[in-house]
A protein has these predicted regions:
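An acidic, low-aromatic, low-complexity terminal/linker signal
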Residues: 1-164
Length: 164
């Protein structure tokens, strides 16, 4: 079992994801397809070892910045995470460090992140990173919409015309 957290930069904040949910981290790549009827923070899908995985602009999803284009994130990274609902790619502005410190509970959760935070970690003498709850990053409705669009994308194209 993996322990600790990966420190990420999301817009101007330092956040963390628990290592047990992270499969791999890679440099940002352009999506290979767009999804249509999904929230604006969904950038499209990327190929992860032969599987199409939805790519989420994590800072935009958290309300830390407006939705961005893949080009605006070209210097960023993708944290591929595995949840009970499947594989997801989380586009972030930067990846900094692995920390194996004790997580501390929050006394007050930031209003825009209520229910999304597990606790906080000390990153330095003056900085803390909020530890996100990966299972709560996407709502049930958003997961359903994204799943429906992925299913549409996976369908074979219909042939024009009828039987000959």
């Amino acid at each position: 079992m993996k322990h600790g957290c990966l420190i990420l930069s999301c817009a101007s904040m330092q956040l963390a994801l628990p290592l047990e949910s992270i499969l791999e981290v890679s440099r940002m790549v352009a999506p290979c397809a767009k999804l249509l009827r999904v929230p604006r923070y969904v950038l499209g899908v990327v190929d992860f070892h032969g599987q199409l995985v939805p790519l989420i602009d994590l800072p935009a999803r958290l309300g830390l910045c407006p939705p961005r284009s893949p080009e605006a994130l070209i210097a960023g990274h993708i944290a591929f995470i595995e949840l009970p609902s499947g594989l997801w790619g989380m586009a972030v502005d930067g990846v900094h460090d692995l920390i194996n410190e004790q997580m501390e509970p929050l006394t007050i959760e930031p209003r825009h992140l209520v229910g999304l935070v597990l606790g906080s970690l000390r990153v330095s003498a003056t900085e803390r990173a909020l530890v996100l709850n990966p299972g709560r990053l996407l709502s049930v409705v958003a997961r359903a919409r994204i799943g429906a669009e992925l299913s549409e994308l996976a369908k074979p194209p219909e042939r024009a015309g009828g039987p000959a």
